[in-house]
């Protein structure tokens, strides 16, 4: 009897197997765009239809094609016929665990638990996505928080922008990434394990390998001091040539790009000669720096909107910064944009990045206005935040344009961003991977 029951059960399962094996119906979404900037750098292509299957663009057609006429009767239709539609934006320099710097954030760094910082990071990620930035490159935090957030987003456990993450940034002892700067010697080990600090080529090779072992997507280093470094050591070179070369060579062994925090020209030149992929901030660029950018093909990420964060923090609390840091803040505000004015006409490759965490998360698009103020056309600024930033991140096959095969990450605005980049501050619609995240278009 038992054998008979088992036989019947196996027969029933076998009969059901084809049904169980059937793939789910594809999810089709059709977007009708009033004006489509599918490939920034080119003119808008006018009224268009974007066909999306399971989160990927499969087709772009001229005109507003009905779902049935497109061969997808019953598909979801998103009506953006009164909007400019363009690819999701890319911010290539954010710090999702951080908020505007100052005395408070210094205290929070040692008071907040990693769990509390993780919730902050998730909230900041959602603000960023809501602002139309569907991809970000996170350039430094501690405790592996953004690495975990990156993985959670990729697995679909939480909603946020796609994240490319550098883990913990590397510098020398007493360099910009030394988290215990400004604290007593006896507190240094209690505050941080300092495994992101290296002195000498061999130590720097090991430090890179530690970051790779933790699963980072790229390496971030500092070759100069930083504005928010809690010492008055200036913004010049703080790493030797052989240390920078050792870092780049080791990163290359593992197929990792290298992004470099550098303000002073000496640190910029050191990094470019070492073969890095991008310079972040690049506040002072002399003629030799610009020639090296052109020669090496490295990217320049100017992070102009940090000045907004500084100005807002000072307005809220004139004593937010120590005298040593305030002097650097005032200098950064004074010279911001001067290097971009020189770099753009010379053909230096520029990618969009804000340093959000110094400036406010969710206001990433403020950078566009400053890029235009300091020498870029609206079209160039938009390319920097789409095609160019995607290339810098190694994601040209996934992001930056709306073409068949790429992720269906798109945004919509009222008004032409090629005439007025400030419309990008008011994104009314955000879709990531074919799923609507934000829709405030009204009736």
Predicted regions and their residues:
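Bacterial N-terminal signal peptides
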Residues: 7-16
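Divalent metal-dependent hydrolysis catalytic cores, especially in the metallo-beta-lactamase
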Residues: 120-146, 160-169, 216-229, 257, ...
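Active-site gating loops and adjacent loop-to-helix segments of metal-dependent hydrolytic enzymes
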Residues: 97-117, 173-193, 227-240, 296-333
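Histidine/acidic-residue-rich catalytic or RNA/ligand-binding cores of hydrolases
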Residues: 100-104, 146, 175-176, 229-231, ...
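His/Asp/Glu-enriched, well-ordered alpha-helical/loop segment
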Residues: 109, 253, 257, 321-324, ...
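Alpha-helix-loop-beta-strand connector modules within alpha/beta enzyme cores
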Residues: 151-169, 235-260, 301-305
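Histidine-rich, glycine-flanked metal-binding segment
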Residues: 23-27, 36, 40-86
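Metal-associated gating/positioning segment near the N- to mid-region
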Residues: 83-157, 173-178, 242, 266, ...
